[in-house]
């Protein structure tokens, strides 16, 4: 899951982890995790902290990999399906729910967080087989959000 985070994000998250790992044991306890997440701009409740530790940590502690896994999922979950589909609609010239593979390639490699060419090729292969046809973007978005 850490692969969903770019190197810059991973570096920032490691910095927060190191800053709030008070006893420098490589693990964040509940209070340390809460402070780390607040430093990263989140405001979790105590029950949310407990839930995060249950799901991504062990023995009420979380290592840096657990933090990456949680934040990687959070980054994906923060993108609402409807918002992503609305973004695709900007590139849907005919209003038919389709986008050209070349347009999708351009979006994925040139806008926002640029994806590596290999990852784009795999996504296009899954979406249209040969990678050169039109893509029905609603099912494409749903499929990408499941991963």
UniProtKB/Swiss-Prot annotation:
Any Pfam family? EF-hand_7
Alphabetic keyword roster: Calcium, Cytoplasm, Metal-binding, Motor protein, Myosin, Repeat
Q: Which domain of life is it from?
A: Eukaryota
Q: Report the locations given in the UniProt record.
A: Cytoplasm
Domain (EF-hand): give its ranges.
Answer: 8-43, 79-114, 115-147
Give the Gene3D superfamilies listed for this entry. EF-hand
Report the SMART domains cross-referenced here: EFh
The residues listed in the UniProt record as binding Ca(2+), with positions renumbered to this chain, are: 21, 23, 25, 27, 32
Cellular component (GO) terms are: actin wave; cytoplasm; macropinocytic cup cytoskeleton; myosin complex
MF (Gene Ontology): calcium ion binding; enzyme regulator activity; myosin heavy chain binding
What biological-process terms (Gene Ontology) are attached?
microtubule cytoskeleton organization
What does the record note on quaternary structure?
Myosin I is a dimer of a heavy and a light chain. Inability to self-assemble into filaments. Interacts with myoD. Does not interact with myoB or myoC.
**What is the role of the protein in this entry?**
Functions as the light chain for myosin-D. Has low affinity for calcium.
Protein name in UniProt: Myosin-ID light chain
């Amino acid at each position: 899951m850490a692969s969903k985070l770019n190197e810059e994000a991973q570096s920032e998250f490691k910095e927060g982890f190191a800053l709030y790992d008070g006893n420098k044991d490589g693990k964040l306890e509940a209070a340390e995790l809460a402070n780390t997440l607040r430093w990263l701009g989140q405001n979790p409740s105590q029950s949310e902290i407990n839930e995060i530790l249950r799901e991504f940590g062990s023995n009420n502690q979380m290592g840096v990999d657990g933090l990456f896994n949680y934040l990687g999922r959070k980054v994906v979950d923060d993108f609402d399906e409807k918002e992503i589909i609305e973004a695709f609609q900007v590139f849907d010239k005919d209003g038919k729910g389709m986008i050209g593979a070349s347009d999708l390639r351009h979006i994925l490699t040139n806008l926002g967080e640029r994806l590596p060419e290999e990852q784009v090729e795999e996504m296009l292969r899954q979406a249209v087989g040969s990678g050169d046809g039109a893509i029905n973007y609603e099912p494409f978005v749903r499929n990408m959000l499941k991963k």
